[in-house]
Design a protein with these regions (language model features):
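Bacterial N-terminal signal peptides
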Residues: 13-25
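C-terminal PAP-associated
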Residues: 31-536
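Long beta-sheet-rich domains in secretory-pathway and surface-associated proteins
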Residues: 538-658
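Residue-identity detector for glycine
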Residues: 19-21, 536, 657
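Sec/Tat signal peptide C-region and signal peptidase I cleavage site
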Residues: 26-30
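N-terminal secretory signal peptides that target proteins for export/translocation
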Residues: 1-11
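Short linear Ser/Thr-Pro motifs
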Residues: 22-24, 206-208, 616
Length: 658
């Protein structure tokens, strides 16, 4: 395809970064030093307006085509007890307060636009006046004020009409649509290939905020491997993408690979390059996602894009991708931090036959996709702090639950796990999540829900910024309840869904996912809905109201406290000692098990005793390699029946460190 590597960044440069202290040896353990490459698009042009193009069909494909893609990632996770399950100890006191959907309408139905395939890979994005939904090989544009269709459904090949090559003739699916609100442009992508595997990425950037208008189109050849599961993100200096890479036969996982596309050039319709490692990062590296910018407040000036890895080793591996499209040799992809993640149990690590449904046999259980972070990884800068929110699926209480999280300080540090929790309030299986945060700091989570007694449903849950951390305290609502279950189709579901935030008011969430209207095979439908968690100033959480009784007796409870509030250690490390106290109320007399999260790499915690009914000494042994910084960590206590979870925070300061 006549693509040109224009520069290479050597392993020696990576070693220099280590020697200069830009990276510590402990933080870089996950990466094998590799050169980077700059590769030019092999073709670019300007399309005709989409509204003038025919809704071109692609040749019908075998129904197992998409089901054969998206190989599972080898499981390297060691299961540990999940201490973060929120089964509703707080929620049971609160009336569900999530509002009903504002708009709620059907999207593209099976068979899409010429693609007899499953799953649909449903995703969508909201812009200034429109909502664009994509499924495998199809797109549709809606009026966001009414939900009425403006254009489509149309084949994605219509977008590439006249471009030539595999982008026009051999799209493989895995589409993604984003809205670049900094430029008021749409970004649409899918992968393609001349043979049986995807080897190219096709990216189109609109020339205006009208998704039915013209597009700057680009074809990029990535290599000869099997490049799978592309997910894009918007950042001020580039469009960033993650890929899961396999050998050409799809039988061996070679690791993830990050890509950065020249946003400035693509907005202008000029020839563009991407910068990437010359090869995937290795089969021992879990998949990752790039941070996707929400809101109009930019990241700190010059901040790198953040990639976050799936915490298969109970650590959130945070990478920084610095790119320089003018001098590509200045670009680096490095590990920034590896904060601890709460323990969890993998969901169905060796099989796709996992999530039960009503009315079908066990052979038709659905794929839970518990081996990666789910789309999107949403970044927002609030001025006084940065937030990065996401989710993945775990096994909790014998069903699928959703581990959601918020990291802070992801570009400049100090990086902390501000909150994380497993949402599993009952015996329903919840998976296929997508998380985002609005401009008020309210967090929403959209997902699929199913069990042996219900057909798959589309639901959402949320929390206000003022709610207790680690809880989705606003409860749960139903966007749409399917009336059927899926049989056959290789157990596939998803492979992803999409929750986005309206750029005009920064408070309205838009969510899209799939469902089935009847129990059958290859008959999916998609749904699109919008909702809010708050407007203006976030609404305070409702005050718990106990059930009236003739002689009310407060329930046993406790709180946690820690002293001192801050301890410092010097450049050589040492021990930081705190006292954690269980403060019982109303006759609480149970043992409380303590855990800690948010500590920097190189820090080992020990509680003595643990569990405790009174006090426990927390000793943090800080290694000399721990980076200089101020780290806010969270101590969590779990005790009582039913389990009561309480938290407290303190600070560890490493001075004159590396």
């Amino acid at each position: 395809m006549n693509y040109k590597p224009t520069s290479a960044l050597t392993a020696a440069r990576f070693a220099t970064l280590l020697g200069c202290g830009v990276l510590s040896a402990s933080s870089a353990f996950a990466l094998t030093p590799q050169p980077l490459q700059a590769t030019a698009s092999y073709h670019n042009d300007l399309s005709r307006p989409l509204r003038e193009m025919a809704a071109a069909d692609t040749p019908s494909r075998r129904q197992d085509r998409e089901a054969a893609e998206n190989p599972k990632i080898p499981n390297s996770h060691v299961d540990t007890p999940d201490q973060l399950v929120d089964r509703g100890s707080l929620l049971r006191f609160l009336a569900p307060s999530l509002p009903a959907p504002i708009l709620n309408f059907d999207g593209i139905p099976f068979p899409g636009v010429g693609c007899n395939c499953a799953p649909p890979d449903t995703n969508g994005e909201v812009g200034a006046t429109q909502y664009v939904q994509m499924v495998n090989e199809g797109y549709q544009v809606f009026d966001k004020a009414t939900g009425n269709s403006i254009l489509g459904p149309s084949s994605i090949t219509s977008l590439w009409s006249g471009f030539g090559g595999v982008c026009q003739t051999s799209g493989f699916g895995d589409p993604v649509v984003l809205y670049d609100q900094l430029a008021n442009r749409w970004v649409i992508s899918q992968f393609a290939g001349a043979g049986s595997i995807p080897t190219d990425e096709c990216v189109a950037v609109s020339t205006s905020s009208d998704a039915t208008g013209t597009y700057n189109r680009y074809g990029f050849h990535l290599g000869t491997n099997f490049f799978d599961y592309p997910h894009l993100a918007v950042w001020p200096d580039g469009y960033y993408m993650s890929m899961n890479v396999f050998n050409s036969s799809g039988t061996a996982y070679l690791g993830p690979q990050p890509f950065a596309f020249d946003r400035t050039a693509m907005l202008a319709g000029a020839p563009a390059i991407f910068i990437s490692p010359v090869a995937p990062l290795g089969g021992s590296i879990p998949p990752f996602l790039p941070a996707d910018l929400d809101g109009s407040t930019l990241p700190p000036s010059g901040a790198p894009n953040t990639f976050l890895g799936f915490p298969s080793s109970n650590k959130y591996t945070v990478y920084h991708f610095h790119v320089d499209f003018t001098v590509p040799g200045n670009s680096t992809f490095t590990t920034f931090a590896t904060p601890a993640a709460g323990g969890f149990t993998s969901l169905c690590p060796t099989t796709r036959s996992c999530v039960p449904q009503l009315g079908v046999t066990s052979s038709s259980k659905l794929d839970g996709i518990g081996d990666r972070l789910m789309f999107r990884l949403a970044y927002r800068n609030f001025g006084d702090h940065e937030s990065l929110v996401g989710n993945f699926t775990v096994s909790a209480g014998g069903v699928a639950g959703i581990r959601w999280f918020e990291l802070r300080g992801v570009t400049a540090g100090p990086l902390t796990v501000f909150q994380e929790s497993t949402y599993q309030p009952d015996t329903t299986w919840r998976w296929m999540g997508s998380a985002a945060m609005d401009g008020q700091g309210n967090l929403a989570l959209g997902f699929s829900a199913s069990s042996g007694s219900i057909h798959p449903q589309i639901r959402y849950a949320g929390r206000l910024a003022t709610d207790p951390i680690n809880t989705l305290a606003q409860g749960e609502a139903h966007l749409f309840d399917g009336a059927g279950s899926q049989s056959a189709t290789g157990n596939r579901w998803g492979d992803y869904s999409s929750l986005t935030v309206d750029p005009t008011d920064d408070t309205t969430f838009w969510y899209t996912n799939e469902y089935y209207p009847t129990t059958t095979t290859f008959n999916w439908r998609t749904r699109i809905g919008s909702f809010k968690l708050g407007t203006g100033t976030p609404t305070p959480t409702p005050t718990p109201t106990p059930t009236p009784t003739p002689t009310p007796t407060p329930a046993p409870d406790y709180s946690l406290s820690i002293s001192p509030s801050s301890v410092s250690v010097g450049r050589n490390g040492g021990s930081a000692v705190y006292t954690v106290t269980v403060n019982p109320t109303n006759g609480f007399s149970s043992l409380v098990t303590l855990s800690v999260a948010g500590l920097p790499a190189g820090t080992t915690p020990v509680f003595s005793p643990n569990p405790t009914m009174a006090t426990s000494t927390l000793t943090l042994t800080v290694d000399s390699s721990t980076r200089k910084g101020t780290y806010v960590f969270t101590v969590t206590g779990m005790g009582g029946s039913p389990t009561i979870t309480r938290t407290t925070t303190a600070t560890l300061v490493k001075t004159n460190g590396r």
